Amino acid sequence: MPRSFLVRKPSDPRRKPNYSELQDACVEFTFQQPYDQAHLLAAIPPPEVLNPAASLPTLIWDSLLVPQVRPVAWATLPLRESPKAVELTSLSDEDSGKSSQPPSPPSPAPSSFSSTSASSLEAEAFIAFPGLGQLPKQLARLSVAKDPQSRKIFNCKYCNKEYLSLGALKMHIRSHTLPCVCTTCGKAFSRPWLLQGHVRTHTGEKPFSCSHCNRAFADRSNLRAHLQTHSDVKRYQCQACARTFSRMSLLHKHQESGCSGGPR
């Protein structure tokens, strides 16, 4: 045999393939008979072994096994039995044939709070007060906030008075220091409006006048007291003569003048 037949010649890249020969060489896979369920189950591996990309065999496997698998009725199980508890129970039943000891009962599902944790939470939620017993912490905070003894107390350095706010203490200290001084007579006052009313006694200014009798007053408070004399309601009554007065000061003047006891 010539040696040229044993040497492989390189293929010509310009040569076109014969597609008709390739089509004849293809083998057509057709099923001449209906599917055999047992044959498919034996031939197709379970989905855990198959590649996740192979979706068609997985679908066939699931569709064939769905009518055969009996679903577990979880709704009929008690609430305390979880799927883990069911597995433990089945394993203990299988092991009971191998060992002589009776199967242990399934352990109940662990609760979210034990007795010790519940007692500790209850102890943290309540606080003890002398004379009041156990009180919730929220009520205890409110009672402490409302208790004057729990607040900070401000003491006056001139006297023994105590105040709960710094502003009230500052207003009280002005009654000791008397910062408002009259330039005419040197009299001192704790408030500016008191000094202003005092200065009007020197100047003779009376800006507040009565609309009933045209009397004028240097201070507005004196005008209010005067207007009570024009009112019909007289609340202050003399016990001796049954005479009524609109102001307590007028009643005192009446008693000091010497009430005879008869009506006037």
Curated annotation (Swiss-Prot):
Signal peptide: none annotated. Keywords: ADP-ribosylation, Cytoplasm, Developmental protein, DNA-binding, Glycoprotein, Isopeptide bond, Metal-binding, Nucleus, Phosphoprotein, Repeat, Ubl conjugation, Zinc, Zinc-finger. One of its GO terms (molecular function) is E-box binding. Residues 10-40 are annotated as: LATS2 binding. Involved in induction of the epithelial to mesenchymal transition (EMT), formation and maintenance of embryonic mesoderm, growth arrest, survival and cell migration. Binds to 3 E-boxes of the E-cadherin gene promoter and to the promoters of CLDN7 and KRT8 and, in association with histone demethylase KDM1A which it recruits to the promoters, causes a decrease in dimethylated H3K4 levels and represses transcription. Involved in induction of the epithelial to mesenchymal transition (EMT), formation and maintenance of embryonic mesoderm, growth arrest, survival and cell migration. SUPFAM superfamilies: beta-beta-alpha zinc fingers. One of its GO terms (biological process) is hair follicle morphogenesis. Residues 151-264 are annotated as: Required for nuclear localization and interaction with KPNB1, NOTCH1 and PARP1. This is Zinc finger protein SNAI1. Residues 2-7 are annotated as: Required and sufficient for interaction with KDM1A. The lineage of its organism: Eukaryota, Metazoa, Chordata, Craniata, Vertebrata. It is found in: Nucleus; Cytoplasm. Its main location: nucleus. Glycans are attached at residue 112. Belongs to the snail C2H2-type zinc-finger protein family. Disruption phenotype: Embryos die early in gestation, exhibiting defects in gastrulation and mesoderm formation. Recessive lethal mutation.
